[in-house]
Amino acid sequence: QSQHRNLTIHIGCDSIVRGGTVWYVTAVVFRYGAHGAHFIFSKVNVPSYRKYDNKPDIFTRLFQEAVYTLEIANFLIDNNIFMKEDIVLEFDYNDMKITKSTPLVGAAAGMATSQGYNILLKSDLQMACKAANQICQSC
């Protein structure tokens, strides 16, 4: 268990397309109750996803954000760094109105909750996704 009773770990990912490259930033936010937070992040880039007709494949790009988020969370659990109850996964998918990310809400929420994680969606107060978005802007 975490040494700090009020510590929660928020993990979220955002992406941005620049030219023919997709940049993914996954942020891990250490939230100390009402006493502030800090974060670390990883940044990777891959070639832009395309459909068979050469149009951008937005679904694959957005789904990969959930995959990166879960990979980091599982790494932290598998290596006994944190416990699941300390972790909140954030998915930057809109559950309040219809957008390109809306179809991913069920898939991402299902993957995460079936593994026992707590989640936040775009309509919730997110820290990790906002931090990741901020870093994405400089990619």
Language model region names:
Residues 11-12, 16-43:
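Acidic, metal-ligating active-site segments
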Residues 91-127:
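Short, low-complexity, polybasic intrinsically disordered segments
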